[in-house]
Design a protein with these regions (language model features):
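Flexible loop and strand-edge segments within Gram-negative outer membrane beta-barrel domains
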Residues: 117, 138-173
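Transmembrane beta-strands of outer-membrane beta-barrel proteins
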Residues: 42, 60, 74-78, 98-102, ...
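Hydrophobic, lipid-facing positions within transmembrane beta-strands of outer-membrane proteins
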Residues: 55-57, 71-73, 80-84, 124-128, ...
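Short acidic/polar hinge/loop motifs at secondary-structure boundaries
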Residues: 17-44, 128
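Residue-level signature of outer-membrane beta-barrel architecture
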Residues: 63, 77, 88-90, 132-134
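Outer-envelope beta-barrel architecture signal
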Residues: 10, 36, 69-73, 91-97, ...
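A beta-strand signature from Gram-negative outer-membrane beta-barrel systems
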Residues: 31-74, 83-85, 94
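Extracytoplasmic beta-strand/coil segments of soluble accessory domains associated
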Residues: 1-21, 38
C-alpha cells in the first residue's frame, strides 16, 4: 500500500490484468513467482493515461515468455517458500510455455513450536503463460495465475479448528 491507500486506491497489473488481492501473509509475499517476472514498473503520483483511476499507485508486473530455444528448469528455495519454474519451446522460436508454482513451508515448522505459538498458515500460488509469436512485433499470450492462503485457527473453548480458505484467481482464455 502506498500513501496509506487501500486496495481500491492502488492498482497491480499482471500482464495488463488487474490483480485484486496481490499478496499472501497480509501482503508480505506477492502472489506471483519472482522467477517468472520479466520486469516491473512502479508509478506513484502521476500515471500514464491508460493507467488512470487510482489515487495512490499503479504497479505493472510483466511475466516472462517461455524460453523459445531450449527447455529450462529452475528450483528456488528460500525462507518463506520453495518454487519451481519450467519453461521452453513447444514450436521452436514460435510457441513457448512458462509454468511456475510456489508453496510456503512455514507450516512445516509448526511441529517445532508449542501449540499456542503455531503459525497454522500455508500459501500456494501458480503462474503460467503460453506465448505464440506471429512475427517479431506481434505476440499472442495466454496467462493464468492462482493463489491460495490456508489459515487454521484453533478455537480455545472446545479445541476444534476452523479453516479459512480464501481463493483468488483470474483466468484468461
Amino acid at each position: 500500500m502506498v500513501d496509506g491507500g487501500g486496495y481500491d486506491e492502488n492498482l497491480l497489473l499482471l500482464d495488463g490484468v488487474p490483480v485484486f488481492h496481490p499478496g499472501h501473509l497480509s501482503s508480505l509475499l506477492p502472489v506471483f513467482n519472482g522467477d517468472a517476472v520479466k520486469n516491473m514498473v512502479f508509478h506513484k503520483g502521476f500515471f500514464p493515461t491508460p493507467l488512470e483511476g487510482r489515487i495512490s499507485s499503479v504497479t505493472e508486473v510483466n511475466l516472462k515468455e517461455g524460453n523459445k530455444k531450449e527447455h529450462v528448469r529452475t528450483l528456488t528455495l528460500d525462507m518463506p517458500a520453495a518454487s519451481v519454474m519450467l519453461e521452453g519451446p513447444i514450436i521452436k522460436n514460435k510457441l513457448s510455455y512458462m509454468v511456475g508454482a510456489r508453496r510456503s513451508w512455514l507450516d512445516f515448522f509448526d511441529s517445532l513450536l508449542s501449540e499456542e505459538n503455531r503459525l497454522n498458515h500455508s500459501t500456494y500460488d501458480y503462474n503460467a503463460k503460453l506465448s505464440y509469436n506471429f512475427s517479431p512485433v506481434t505476440t499472442l499470450n495466454f496467462l493464468t495465475y492462482g493463489a491460495r492462503d490456508d489459515y487454521h485457527l484453533p478455537l480455545q473453548e472446545n479445541g476444534e479448528n476452523v479453516s479459512v480458505l480464501p481463493e483468488f484467481g483470474i483466468s484468461l482464455e
